[in-house]
Amino acid sequence: MSPALLFCILIAYFALLLGVAWATSRNANNDSFFIGNKSSNWMLVAFGMVGTTLSGATFISVPGAVGIDAFGYGQVLIGYVFGYIAVVYLLLPLYYRLKLTSIYTYLDGRLGRRAYQSGAGFFILSRLFGATARLYLVVAVLQGIILDSLGVPFWLTTFVILGMILLYTYQGGVKTIVWTDTLQTTCMLGGLFACVYFMLGQLDLSIPQALQQMHERGLSRVFTFDPDSPNFWLKQIVAGAFIVLTMTGMDQEMMQKTISVKTLKDSQKNLLALTAVLVVVLSSFLFLGGLLYLYAPVAGVTATGDKIFSTVVMGHLPAAVQIIFLIALISALFPSADGAITALTSTFCIDILGIQRRQDMTEEAKGRLRRHVHLGFALLFLVMVLFFKWVDNPSMIGVILKLASYTYGPLLGLFAFGMMTTRSLNDRLVPVVTIGAPILCALLEYNQHYLLGNYRLGLELLMVNGALVFIGLYAISRRATIKPAVVTA
């Protein structure tokens, strides 16, 4: 299909997004931007969060990783279920009881200002790396299938896409994103199931026959039983639970949408519904990956990893499937980037600049400052995407989860210490602990050959990081003379 036609489809899709944004952002204010005026429909939030949770990294990398790890990602998926249950029944009641706009305000009331700012700072770092890595992956695919042939440079593609995101989130924030993410999730899931349907047709297989062939070729293996392997089943399941606990339950972007729902009960239904949908969708992505690796030898495709999906679709499937793939790919791109920029803006304004505590600023001045911060993060996203272009790792899902182990570990330690103890901290030393723990983890990972023998660290590095922060916080704490105002839910 002509790159020019595909480009026109891209523009038409964005025009639709702008229409939705215009309709939902009228009469928006700062509360609309930060928490959607606390009036978001839980079903819309749950459905839209599927797109945010999955992102372009899932769309491209999870099917691509089947060639290396088979269905091993299913171990992490099992852990996700336990993690969501923990968020629903441990963290959400706490956030609603305290009526939080930023979830890191909890750390301020319980542990102190430095702990509060450390938590917000690590969230900013986490989302900045994670969201830009996801954005890079999808931009790179779009560049390869459309824009290289039109002579458009990579940096300009990224700049224009970020400009598009700014246009439809600049005013409405969360109030707009709840609706645009719903539209984009619909397109992404439609693309996923359409690709599965067409791949089965190309291979002339039913679902049971396809699974049988995957089994014969070793593509359907889920569990790894070698305890020294980074993919050992118990490590992966436990790590999956902690990934959700931190990357959803302690993540302002994900919780910002969740706590925009009016009541705790509806918010809990939102996350439980999200969990059920994610199990089906991620299993479908693994199945699609198996189909791609069954089809590749037949079609003479040599691409692997993150490149196999786009190579098969754009080079070997009908034009209709190519259009569906493009729309689904764009739909996977925007939710992970728009929500991240909005959440980073919220966290920086509320937690770092203290915009809601500023009595000396008018509502208009606060809105102007918030828009400047929003623009600043968009420019920072551009720089980070160009950095990942320079790195050019062949499997970005691994990079994203590895980065999460380092940046979400301090959040895990801070929240765990606040909820599991009643001790008070030496607030000045908190940054030393939260920065020191990831450095120790990096040294441990680099020297694991000498320190751990045949054992290889995997995603459990997140738990090690969190445990080091917890131990460090305990070391700089003392028994509280009065009961803390905020401890647990």
Kindly give the residue locations of the regions a language model identified:
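Membrane-embedded helix-loop-helix hairpins and adjacent transmembrane boundary segments
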Residues: 1-489
